[in-house]
Amino acid sequence: MASEIYRRLPMELPAQHLLASLALVGALLSVGYLLLRPAKYQLPLPPGPRGLPIIGNLHQAPKEKAWEVYKQWSDRYGPIMSVNNGGMITIIVSSHEVVKNFLEKNNAVFSSRPQLLVLERALYGFTTPALPYGEKWLKHRALRGAVLKPAMAVRYRGLQDLESKQLLRDLLYSEDFTQCMRRQAASLFLGIAYGNRFPEETPEIIDIDQAVAQLGGISESMFQGTGMLREFFPVLKYFPGYDKFLKQLDDVGERLANIYVRRFRDGLSTPAWNWAKEYSKRPEAQGMGELELSFCIGSTYQASLTPYEILRIILLAAICHPEEKARLQKEIDLVVGKDNLPGWEHKDRIQFVQAFIYEALRWHAFSPLGAPRAVSRDIEYKGYFIPKGATLVLNQWAMDHDENVYDNPFTFRPQRWIDNPDLPHVIFGFGLRGCPGQHLARDHLFINTARLFWAFNFGNAYENGKKVELDLDELMQPRGGGSAFNQVPSFKASVIIRSSERRQIVENEWDAVEKDEQKILAEAMPLPE
């Protein structure tokens, strides 16, 4: 659904209006940069592909699979390189070593965001992940940290357990595993955030999904074609066609605002504990209005769907690598047995589950370029100048396919993570901008991966008695705009319970589990500080 919406969004400005502004603004930016650059920083920028006068490397901007193009460039120019987008510098990092020895050690320098004018307008300047480093972002971060810290993730396990058991039972009666898993992820977030879970897909879930998909289309448009130029050259707002674009932004922003505020008010009135109530009473919320608090919570929804996307990657990896899937099930059965569902007590005992998750994400990165960061002050690295205001991009796909770190990086081999537990990964980012919900996400991925493969065999689907082969080339093609996210499109699979005994256990566990969200969320309420 999301990818279809992306393709229907007309986000491009007329190309004939770009050249004049590019020539003028690009020249001014380039000359100004050279004239105002401090004398003490007469060091070269990191190397990169040679550009053209004025526009730099804009004509070389990849139209799809940017991470692979950047990997080819990094093989030539090194693990840290620069590109010039008409006077605006982007630093691209393709090495775990640079992340560890430079970025993490200078965390404060790389913890801001570029000023994204499009998102700022569409989201009223209240969407936490897009905020630059500053007082507002620190308050938002403190609010999220209060409900997403490790101790809180443990307290959400009651709701995780319920949603996981419903997913298993739903799969006994439905062939649409994608819809079942998406409902689960949405219901988990809506339950924690607003105090009401959704046992079935409802118009409320569809409405927020469609609005978030529209936002995703706008986000993708900023990193490709003339969409990139809107961010780099705000002067384009004076050209014909911009009013139509602004109308689209305002429509999406208004739609999201209505959804988020409505859900926020519902959360305040529901009997169960939830984030809306918790945020409202915390000292960090002093001075925040209803709209800002609503966006602070609501903007987490898109991130909450990431584990759902990752589970689909895990299922695809298992179907494409049946020998590794068989070992995964063997390891789960060895630790858990056939008479009980995997539980939290098994988390540290089934090492192969975590290894399989890490390898699936290395094999097919969901966010291969991560979210862009902004450099907050001039800094030097190994004789290269990294200027304040530059955009920082982490090529996570290149890092995950680095031959110097991973032996045979294009081979799917979960055992590598057991042989070397210290292998690096950037699944959840790093530093102050690391994913605040990673502990909740890790629990979600473990309990669902372990239980799904304990209960079911996943394999190729059959139609009219013929096996449906998966076209990996097609499935690996980027979706969305191909810049920030690499969602796996819908694919067919067979979902077969492993035995009648396991089917009965799934049914019994569902019948016995506590389903009253008010009781479950009472256990999630934070302890007094």
Curated annotation (Swiss-Prot):
Needed cofactors: heme
Enzyme Commission code(s) on record: 1.14.99.-
Pathway the protein takes part in: Alkaloid biosynthesis
Transmembrane portions of the chain: 13-35
Residue pairs linked by disulfide bridges in the UniProt entry: none
Residues binding heme: 435
GO annotation, cellular component aspect: membrane
Catalytic activity, reaction form: okaramine C + 2 reduced [NADPH--hemoprotein reductase] + 2 O2 = okaramine A + 2 oxidized [NADPH--hemoprotein reductase] + 4 H2O + 2 H(+)
Family recorded in the similarity comment: Belongs to the cytochrome P450 family.
Name under which the protein is recorded: Cytochrome P450 monooxygenase okaD
Naturally occurring in which organism (per UniProt): Penicillium ochrochloron
Gene: okaD
